[in-house]
Each structure stands twice: as C-alpha cells, then as structure tokens.
Amino acid sequence: MARCADRNDDMTLHRYVPPFSLPPHGDALAADSWHVIAGRGAATLQLPAHWPSLWLPMRGRLSMQAQDAHWTLFGGEGQLWRAGALNVQASHESRWLALVAAPTVWNVAFANSADDEEPLPWRGDPGDGVHEAMEALAHDDDALALLIPALIDRQRDVAACLPRCRGRTLAHRRQALLRLLNLRHLMQCHVEADDDASIDVPWLASRAHYSPGHLIRLHRAVFGETPSDYFTRLRQARAWELVRETDMPVATITHRLGFESQSAFCRAFKHAFGMTATQARREADACAA
C-alpha cells in the first residue's frame, strides 16, 4: 500500500494510490481523518458501515453492493453514499477517485462551511465543481476547501426536501429524509437491475421501520408522490430505454420489468407514452438512420 499523510490546521488527510490494499471493512482506517483514494485498475474495497463516502469513476465502472441492492456507476457519474456498509469492485480498465471518512469528520467539515448542513446522499452527475475539486484533492490538500462547498451546492435539491419531513428536531427530520432517500435508491437499483422479483410498499416500509401507511403519507408529503408512483415512473423510464436503445424482444422486457404479461406491458407502455412499443422502436430506428 502506498500511502502518504498530510496535515493542515484542521484535519489529517491520508492518500492511497495503487498498488494499495485497504484493511478489511476499513477497521484500521483512522476515524479522525479523511481518506482519499486514487484508484486505477481492478480493485475491491469494503468500507465501514455508517461511513459516508464520495465516489467518482473517471473511466470504466464501479460495481457497488450494499444491503438489499447492487448497482453500477459508470465514468462521468458520481455518488455520495451514506446508507450502511458498502462493497465496491472496480473494473480493470477503470480510473476512479473516492473520499471516505467517519461521520464526525464529514459533519464538522459541512457545519464549518454552512450552518446546519450535513452530507446528504445523491447519485448522478456530480457537477463541474465536485469533479474539479476531487481531481485536485488527489494531490492538493487545499482542494478540500473547494470540495465541501461544491458538495453542499450539489445536494441543494435534496436538502430542499428536508423542511417537508416530519420530526420534532432537525436531527429527526434529517433521519426521516435519509430513510426515504435510501428507499428511493433501492427502487432505482431494483429497476436498473431488471429484477422481476416483487418489491412493494410493505417490503419498503419494513426496511425503513415504518408502517406501510405512514411510509405512503410521508413519501407523498416530502416528494409529492407515493412510493408506488415513483416506482412506476422509474419502470416506465426503464421500459422506454430498453425499447428504444436495445433490440431486446418485448417479451423479454416484459419479464425483466416484472409485468404480469406482455399485453399488460404493452397497455402500460401505450398509456405512458402515447404509442406502442413497436412504434417507439421504429421511431428510434428511423432517427438512428
């Protein structure tokens, strides 16, 4: 393991560069420090439960696995994760950056940058600010002062949901939001994996330790839709992607997305998009030509 430690007035920052071998489950990582990983090529990492982490694959892909979910991050995407233990496997052609620390390290950094701020989970386009700051942090401690404000800006849309959460204190409302965001992530992973196994409100509610009725009410109050509404939107978007961007038979798409029958899928597709799957595929082929 190649590692260097750098100090400034506020924190210790450890850098890990290939070849490296992080301790299993991260149990030997210093809990009062930042850990920056500049990865290249195949690698497998196991991170401690409850440690937030930021992931940016620059090239290739990262296969992520947590309780009840597995998903893939591709080059150009990013994710801030804080929902339990995480296993990460990097592809052999990958180049990626990660920032890992104990919750107290993250919380102090966010609170010092903006009152009442705390890292919130997100997945998708990291934005130029986060991307550039992480690239710089791989070799420059001072880039952390740029990264934290960029992360706060990146999570602004997520943080806007916080006042709509129920709870007597800010900590209670934040905990409710984290639970809901994790459930939405589980639904997204389920649809992306084309998993035809059953996923329903009672199953989701059990993961968040809510009753089904309470979950429905809270999710609607925070996001303006029920969990079922959100799952339907995700499945519709996935159906559109598979129909338009692959040559997968409709019968196979039906099975992968968990529809009861091909006719049920075709009815749902036409209701959602105003055209049949065949018409959508022909339109895509015409555009490609």
Predicted features, each with a name:
Residues 54, 175, 192, 196-197, ...:
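Helix-turn-helix/winged-helix DNA-binding modules
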Residues 207-209, 257-258, 269:
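Core residues of bacterial helix-turn-helix
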Residues 227, 276-277:
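Proline-centered helix-kink/hinge sites
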Residues 181, 185-189, 198-202, 220-262, ...:
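Terminal helix-turn-helix DNA-binding modules in bacterial transcription factors
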Residues 11-117:
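N-terminal regulatory/effector-sensing and dimerization cores
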Residues 4-10:
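Short, Lys/Arg-enriched N-terminal segments with co-localized hydrophobic residues
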Residues 215, 219, 264-265, 269:
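Short hydrophobic/aromatic patch on the recognition helix
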Residues 115-128, 135-208, 221-233:
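Short, Lys/Arg-enriched, Trp-marked, Pro/Gly-tolerant hinge/linker segments that flank
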